[in-house]
Amino acid sequence: MKKLFLVIVPLLLSLLATSCSTSNVPPPTPLAEKPPKEAKVKVKWSRKTGNGNGGLPIYNVSPTYANNTVFVPNQNGVAYGLSITDGKIVWKHDTGTILSSQPNTIANAVIFGSVKGVLTAVDQKDGKILWRTDAPSSIFSQPTIYSNHLYTHTHDGSVTSFDATNGSKVWNVTNNIPEITLPSDSSPIILNDTVMVGSAFGTVLGFTLESGDRTINLPVAIAHGSSPADKMVDITANPMLYGNYLIFAAFQGAIVALDKDTGKMLWAKKASIINNMAINNGVIFTAQANSELKAYDIQTGDTVWTQSTLEWRKITAPIYYKGLIVVADYQGFLHFFNSLNGDYLGRYKLTPKSDFFDYGISGQLVPTEKGILIEADSGTTYLVDAHSDRVIYENILGDYKVNRGKNVKFIYPLEQPKSGSIESSPKALPDKKVDSNKTSKNDTDSNPATTATSTKDIQNPANQEMINSTPVSNTSTKAEKNENTDSSIAEGVVTSNKVQPTPKGKNATIIIGDFSKGDSD
């Protein structure tokens, strides 16, 4: 099955490119001949870390940083450990597989994911393998670390829990996916003992930490349109938890803020977001699918500022660094904006020109207290510092924090376990296959977009709010069950506890319910 999926992925990408080619995408906005020069940039070091991808990014890999070491995945399969001080190679290790995601760290281990679905944990000091295990499918998103466990959201829709100390599988849940998806996935987020992910159907799914039982299936957007590409509402941006606000964003759908405890919609705005978001001081920074930058007030969803200077320039996810919002583009330029008002402060050409084209930057920029880590499509990794005298800032990295739970301090190689060093892993539970369009056996008339557990249900309230320019028919029909597609999500709009016909048009409908836990009625 995994081999078949690896064959299908390039075909789907080809179909997606063909579909998008007919949508008359505008050309990239030309850069100004005389840009502002209010940003001061210093390249601290650069290091060749492989051959890159020939300027044709498919898997947008990016580095991570811990314990004064930069860990760099390469699409040629080689993992690097670099000194954060000068970029010198501390170690390198050939994993034998195409690395396709940003790695993550726990204790002394750094964990890499690959397009073949292989997870490899190596020692941060020397790159020696600690353990290796198989995930269900391609890994395009950074694995999530929480309390000695590793959670993955793979490209076939599966959500899997592993023991991070030895790689053993704890549980796995398979989920449906549409016929065409974006070549990326959202990372899981842990909240209230629940593993939450954004799905390719534009829904928020939640699973219990211990066993993977599904407790949440909350639609964020409904797909409209005639072609598979028009119907895409993938949630590929990582969800973010900031104070009481849980933020999700969908492609061709919406950005929404939910109450972290109840799931109640606090606000929702039409948007089309693919890349990750950044947050600082109560403001969410996003790059729309057309490369427009937009900042939102996290309390109200109101637009703080919009910046269209870089429209259609295929920019990376925005990051916050020293009061600046920084993005890179397909020609290898870094662009700098004032985080307070969106003013464009200048650009810097980071990557060299080749004889045929400019090597771009498509992977996630990584802000650290030492500088911004950048892995260019050419295969070179950089550490860059930047600031502007026009911007006053308090924190280098902003105030967004991720809860990683409580983790072990050291992981020993699986081949040579130390006595008492690794607790026996939980007995792996059987894989669960979840058909996200099916209702509970005991609740066939309940909301088809919500699946109940054995003891507690998550229900959408009857007074759901929705944002939709087209009126919805008042005629209710029950969702049809289908083993291969999520008809209750892709074919209709959920209102109260029924499914109604989808209104015509290509704009997605935003629909929100609660995921507050309570006994079923």
From Swiss-Prot:
Q: Where is the composition biased (Basic and acidic residues)?
A: 429-444
Q: Which GO terms describe its biological process?
A: Gram-negative-bacterium-type cell outer membrane assembly; protein insertion into membrane
Q: Where is the stretch described as Disordered? A: 418-521
Superkingdom per UniProt: Bacteria
Span of the secretion signal?
1-19
The topology of this chain with respect to the membrane is: Lipid-anchor
Where composition is biased (Polar residues), the residues are: 445-477
Query: Residue positions of N-palmitoyl cysteine lipidation?
Result: C20
Q: One short Pfam family name for this protein?
A: PQQ_2
SMART domains, alphabetized: PQQ (SM00564)
Record localization: Cell outer membrane
Q: Which InterPro entries match?
A: BamB (IPR017687), PQQ_b-propeller_rpt (IPR018391), PQQ_rpt_dom (IPR002372), Quinoprotein_ADH-like_sf (IPR011047), WD40/YVTN_repeat-like_dom_sf (IPR015943)
On whether Membrane is a keyword of this UniProt record, the answer is yes
Cite the entry's keywords alphabetically.
Cell outer membrane, Lipoprotein, Membrane, Palmitate, Signal
Residues bearing a lipid moiety (S-diacylglycerol cysteine): C20
List GO terms (cellular component aspect): cell outer membrane
Main function: Part of the outer membrane protein assembly complex, which is involved in assembly and insertion of beta-barrel proteins into the outer membrane.
Q: How does it assemble?
A: Part of the Bam complex.
Give the family, as the similarity comment puts it: Belongs to the BamB family.
What PANTHER family does the entry give? CELL SURFACE PROTEIN (PTHR34512), OUTER MEMBRANE PROTEIN ASSEMBLY FACTOR BAMB (PTHR34512:SF30)
Q: What is this protein called?
A: Outer membrane protein assembly factor BamB
Instruction: Give the organism, scientific name.
Output: Francisella salina
Query: What's the encoding gene here?
Result: bamB
